[in-house]
């Protein structure tokens, strides 16, 4: 896996372009593991990996607004949830689709993970590679998949494009990374659940759920983990602000 990512990064830097990669497969098969290992290949720092892993468009927009140079990798995790094809008309999706046309000025590699492959056309048409995670091997320690090179500019139909080869990667990553990732993800999941509850007419229940998550989140522990993983003050600030902003969703 590392050689595939390293070659793409080298080509992207040399040719001043970017590559967009979709990683698909059933839940728990190792899509996020691919993204984390791939991003670590570029940054060699797990705190930087977590900083450049996005669960919603607003965090990405905030980061890229102040960027003055392109960075190696960004990850849109669980993209099928917050970038669903059914949301193609929403302004965040439209803006992101437009911004991805300028992705070479932002990130050299952009990785999307999703079980459903249900991304809007303005995202799909910019993809360069699709990696389908197919099986778990070696007693759950490795994931195997197939790399497809996109050869058309339409939404998913009957083919992913040309088969480039088979790829394998570790399904696990360090425990501290998993713990920090789980804290961040739990807050984002709570927000999406609350939004669904509000849309169904259960606003008070949604507030209570968010409050419960707020009380359970250990920000001090998250800070400790980011430092332990090699993060600097700016990494801590950015990641912590994302979590706090999400927890304040119903209190702004």
Residue spans for each PLM region:
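Pre-Walker A adenine-sensing motif
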Residues: 1-15
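Post-Walker A helix-loop "phosphate-sensing" segment adjacent to the P-loop in P-loop NTPases
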Residues: 40-53
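The conserved Walker
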Residues: 26-27
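Pre-Walker A (Motif I) flank of P-loop NTPase domains
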Residues: 15-22
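Conserved lysine of the Walker
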Residues: 31
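Conserved P-loop NTPase motor module
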Residues: 129-131, 142-252
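Conserved nucleotide-sensing/catalytic segment adjacent to the nucleotide-binding pocket
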Residues: 60-109
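A short helix-turn-beta junction within AAA+ P-loop NTPase domains corresponding to the substrate/partner-engaging
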Residues: 122-139
């Amino acid at each position: 896996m590392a050689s595939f990512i390293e070659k793409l990064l080298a080509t992207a830097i040399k040719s001043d372009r970017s590559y967009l990669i979709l990683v698909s497969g059933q839940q728990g098969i190792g899509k996020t593991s691919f993204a984390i290992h791939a991003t670590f290949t570029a940054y060699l720092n797990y705190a930087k990996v977590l900083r450049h892993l996005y669960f919603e468009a607003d965090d990405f927009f905030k980061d890229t607004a102040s960027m003055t140079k392109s960075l190696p990798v960004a990850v849109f995790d669980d993209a099928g949830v917050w970038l669903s094809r059914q949301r193609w008309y929403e302004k965040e999706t439209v803006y992101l689709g437009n911004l991805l046309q300028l992705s070479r000025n932002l990130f050299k590699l952009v990785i999307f993970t999703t079980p459903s492959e249900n991304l809007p056309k303005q995202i799909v048409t910019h993809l360069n590679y699709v990696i389908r995670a197919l099986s778990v091997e070696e007693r759950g320690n490795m994931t195997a998949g197939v790399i497809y090179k996109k050869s058309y500019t339409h939404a998913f139909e009957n083919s992913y494009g040309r088969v480039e080869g088979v790829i394998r990667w570790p399904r696990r990553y360090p425990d501290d990374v998993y713990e920090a990732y789980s804290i961040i993800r739990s807050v984002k999941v709570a927000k999406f659940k609350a939004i669904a509850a509000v849309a169904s007419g259960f606003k008070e229940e949604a507030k209570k759920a968010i409050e419960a998550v707020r009380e359970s989140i250990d920000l001090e522990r998250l800070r400790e983990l980011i430092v332990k993983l090699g993060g600097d003050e700016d990494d801590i600030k950015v990641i912590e602000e994302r979590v706090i902003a999400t927890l304040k969703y119903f209190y702004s």
